[in-house]
A protein has these predicted regions:
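Solvent-exposed loop/turn and edge beta-strand elements of beta-rich ligand-binding domains
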Residues: 1-403
Length: 403
C-alpha cells in the first residue's frame, strides 16, 4: 500500500520561561493534517500529550500539510502551515515549537514627595535611590496565600531621568539599568518580560531624607492608596498575556522632619541670665533655608535663602519650633531683633541640619547659643555745696544697682 505515518513533536520555544511553570503546558495542543496547503481538506487530527508527542496517524504517502488549530495552555497559536513529506511504510515526524505568552508591558514606578505630590525632593533629601523588592511566583496567588519562596526575586532602585521637556522624574522598573541585585530577568525577543503568574512589589528602602513608614502607591487615576505589598497577576487574554491593574504608579514617601531649639546668652557673662534691667525675652530669630531644593514649611514652599519661620525667645531666653516644622536639610538661625537692653553685637548666625525624624536639634549649650552684648553707658555726677552751689572736689560717690 502507498501509505505512511505522520506524527508531531511539540516543544516550548522558550524553556527558560516555561520550565517549572504550571501555567504553561504543551499537552492538549490540537493540529490538523491536511492534504492541501490551504488546509481545507483535513485528513486526520493530532493532539499532543504532556511530553508534546502525538499519536501516529496513517496518511497517503506524499506531502501533507499540518497546522495548529488550538494552542495548549499558556502558548500562542502557531499560524504557520508546515509541510511534511511522508514516505510509504515509514513514519515522518514534524518538530514544532510554540511561543509562550508573556507581557513586555512592565510596571513603572515614579517616586514623589508625599506632601507636595511632586517629583521634586525637599531640602537636601533625594528621591533617587529608593529601593523596591519585586517577587515573581509561577502560579496565581493573592496576598493571603503567597508561597514562602518566590520563583524569582529582584531589587531595583529609582534613578533620575530627564524627559524631552527638561522635567526630571525618579523612576524604577524591571530592567538592568535599575537593578541592584537579584535573579536574571525573564527575556523574550531581546526584551525583559514577565511570564504568566503573580508579581508583587514593595518599597523596602526609602531614599535619603525620606521615611519608609507610611509610603503608598497610587495609580494615575489617584484612586486607591496601596500601602505595603502590591500584588498583581499576569493572565491570558486571547493570544496575549496582560497585566491586571495599572502599569504606572506614583510612590509617595514622607520627608523626614524635625525642629530646633536655641538659647540666648549674655556675651560678657556667658550666662543665660540677663544683666541689670535688660531681658533675654523676645529676641527674634529668623530661620533661613540653605537648601538648593524648595522646602515646605507650614503649607508654603520656600526657596534657598528665604526665611521659612520666625521665632521668639521666652523669659528664659529659649526659642523653639515644633518637632516637625522643618524638612530634611540645612538651615541657618539669624538674630533679626535684639532683646530689650542688648545690642545685636556678638550675635553670630548658627547653621544646623535636620537629619532625624521628630528630633529637635538642641542649640542651647554654650558652644551653640547666640550671644548679645549688653548695652552700656557712662554717668557723670557733680557735687556742689548746699549754700554756695560751688562745685566740690574729691567727693566720692557710691553707685548701687537696683536690679
Amino acid at each position: 500500500l502507498n501509505v505512511g505515518n505522520a506524527k508531531l513533536q511539540k516543544t516550548s520555544s522558550n524553556t527558560s520561561i516555561t520550565d517549572g511553570n504550571g501555567n504553561y503546558s504543551i499537552a492538549g495542543a490540537t493540529y490538523g493534517v491536511f492534504s492541501d496547503k490551504d488546509c481545507t481538506k483535513q485528513l486526520a487530527p493530532l493532539t499532543t500529550d504532556e511530553n508534546g508527542n502525538t499519536d501516529i496517524v496513517e496518511v497517503k504517502a506524499g506531502t501533507v500539510y499540518i497546522k495548529e488549530l488550538s494552542a495548549p495552555a499558556g502558548y500562542k497559536v502557531d499560524k504557520t502551515v508546515y509541510s511534511l513529506k511522508v514516505e510509504a511504510g515509514k513514519t515522518a515526524t514534524l518538530k514544532v515549537s510554540d511561543t509562550p505568552k508573556v507581557t513586555d508591558t512592565l510596571i513603572e514606578l515614579f517616586k514623589i514627595d508625599m506632601e507636595t505630590q511632586k517629583d521634586n525632593p525637599q531640602g537636601s533629601a533625594s528621591l533617587a535611590g529608593a529601593e523596591f523588592t519585586w517577587k515573581y511566583y509561577a502560579g496565581f496567588y493573592n496576598k493571603d496565600n503567597l508561597p514562602a519562596e518566590a520563583t524569582r526575586t529582584w531589587v531595583t532602585k529609582t534613578i533620575a531621568e530627564t524627559d524631552s521637556d527638561g522635567t526630571t522624574h525618579y523612576i524604577t522598573k524591571l530592567a538592568d539599568a535599575y537593578k541592584v541585585s537579584g535573579d536574571s530577568f525573564y527575556m523574550q525577543d531581546g526584551k525583559a518580560v514577565l511570564p504568566l503568574g503573580t508579581l508583587t512589589v514593595e518599597e523596602t528602602k526609602a531614599p535619603n531624607g525620606y521615611l519608609l513608614e507610611g509610603a503608598y502607591m497610587q495609580s494615575g487615576d489617584k484612586s486607591e492608596q496601596i500601602k505595603g505589598l502590591y500584588v498583581t497577576q499576569i493572565t491570558e487574554d486571547g493570544d496575549l498575556a496582560v497585566l491586571s491593574g495599572s502599569n504606572q504608579f506614583s510612590v509617595s514617601d514622607k520627608v523626614i522632619r524635625g525642629g530646633v531649639k536655641i538659647q540666648k546668652r549674655d556675651l560678657e557673662t556667658g550666662d543665660t541670665k540677663p544683666q541689670g534691667s535688660a531681658t533675654l525675652k523676645d529676641t527674634v530669630f529668623d530661620i533661613i533655608s540653605l537648601n538648593d531644593n524648595s522646602v515646605l514649611v507650614e503649607g508654603k514652599l520656600y526657596k534657598k535663602n528665604e526665611v521659612v519661620k520666625t521665632i521668639r525667645t521666652d523669659i528664659e531666653g529659649i526659642a523653639s519650633t515644633s518637632s516637625d516644622l522643618l524638612p530634611y536639610g540645612k538651615f541657618r538661625i539669624v538674630e533679626s531683633e535684639a532683646p530689650d537692653g542688648y545690642l545685636t553685637d556678638g550675635a553670630k548666625p548658627i547653621d544646623f541640619t535636620i537629619t532625624e525624624n521628630g528630633k529637635i536639634v538642641d542649640l542651647t549649650d554654650e558652644a551653640h547659643s547666640i550671644y548679645n552684648q549688653i548695652k552700656r553707658g557712662d554717668i557723670e555726677g557733680v557735687k556742689i555745696g548746699a549754700g554756695t552751689h560751688k562745685r566740690l572736689a574729691d567727693v566720692p560717690f557710691r553707685i548701687t544697682s537696683k536690679t
